[in-house]
Regions:
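GH16 jelly-roll
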Residues: 5-7, 11-279
Length: 279
């Protein structure tokens, strides 16, 4: 009876219907899967002209050098990560547990003037009367009245590097009485490398290897560099035999002599001035 049943036309028709139904259900389930939606997105993106251009450029020999590089530090400023940054001079963090001013600083750097919002780091310069510490070369730490406050961040406790590439994207005004700075330094004041210092004098780049004014002072004001207000990518390549400064990947300065025999340095971002700021 079983053989008669499975050999009947009705049974075979029913089996074909079930197989067809099962295949249809599998196809419907596939279209509902995450893998199916990923495949559709992939096929759509393959047609995107910018992505197609990216894959074409990826094969260009010009970019081969970057494939051997390793990323050592980055921050996109989605949040302010205190494990990466401190908001005062390193000596203040290490010895005083407080902020302080040095040299001709007219401002005191305080953490309230540092904030992060929507992927941007903001350093704010404010007219504000405040009493704070100051390093006097004759008397050491004293107190002083400041008329301004500002913001700075550095990686002294989290990241230091010798050789390699250092890069930052900064928004600068066309003209300013304040100095927008990205610089490298260590536990001593020298060497001090300005990757960018932009202010009332214009764009400056270079490094101090000794006291300002001495022969080793190779800081340079690039008067021919004219920058309109906007965002720029400032790059510093520190190599064994040279140092290279770039703006938007265009070389603006190369140094092959008086190269510092420096240890690993940490990165700093600051906004300030050594003169009474204009309006």
């Amino acid at each position: 009876k079983l053989e008669e049943k499975i050999g009947s036309d009705d049974f075979n028709i029913r089996c074909r219907q079930l197989r067809k139904f099962s295949w249809k259900r599998k196809a419907e389930r596939w279209k509902e899967s995450e893998a199916f939606h990923d495949l559709r997105a992939y096929r759509r993106l393959k047609k995107d002209p910018e992505l197609r251009r990216y894959y074409e450029l990826k094969k260009d020999p010009v970019f081969y050098q970057y494939r051997s590089w390793s990323l050592t530090f980055e921050d996109h400023f989605n949040t302010f990560e205190r494990s990466k940054w401190i908001t005062r001079y390193y000596a203040g963090e290490r010895f005083l547990q407080a902020t302080y001013g040095v040299g001709r600083d007219v401002q005191l750097f305080i953490p309230d003037n540092v904030r992060v919002r929507e992927g941007h780091l903001y350093l704010e310069f404010r007219q504000q009367q405040i009493n704070g510490k100051y390093w006097d070369p004759r008397w050491g730490i004293i107190t002083k009245d400041y008329g301004y406050t500002s913001g700075m961040v550095n990686t002294a406790l989290s990241f230091r590097q010798k050789l390699g590439r250092f890069e930052v994207k900064l928004e600068i005004p066309a003209d300013s009485s304040l100095d927008y700075c990205f610089w490298l330094t260590g536990d001593r004041f020298y060497p001090h490398i300005n990757i960018v210092k932009f202010g009332s004098k214009g764009y400056e780049a270079g490094c101090f290897l000794g006291n300002p004014g001495e022969e080793q002072d190779v800081e340079q004001l690039k008067r021919k560099v004219r920058l309109k207000s906007g965002f720029y990518i400032f790059t510093f390549d520190w190599l064994e035999d040279r140092m290279i400064w770039k703006i938007n990947d265009c070389v603006v300065k190369t140094l092959k002599i008086h190269l510092p025999d420096a240890p690993a340095l940490y990165a700093c971002l600051s906004l300030g001035t050594t003169e009474e700021p204009g309006e």
